[in-house]
């Protein structure tokens, strides 16, 4: 591959007694910089695959309306 214009200029400065600009670069960060993606619909469905869909113990019963009989 060809050298970039910036790399050529850095090499020219080094050869002619200039300072190494690579020393000015910061170090790598202490945390991971890879991209994180949200789960796809398929991954979410596979996670819930073996759970009981009729288990209503985790849901409060405020959404149900039961009319009371008039006495």
Curated annotation (Swiss-Prot):
Source domain of life: Bacteria
Compositional bias per record (Basic residues), positions renumbered to this chain: 1-16
Listed Basic and acidic residues bias regions: 51-64
Region (Disordered): 1-39, 51-71
Biased composition (Polar residues): 25-35
Protein name according to UniProt: Uncharacterized protein YqkK
UniProt source species: Bacillus subtilis (strain 168)
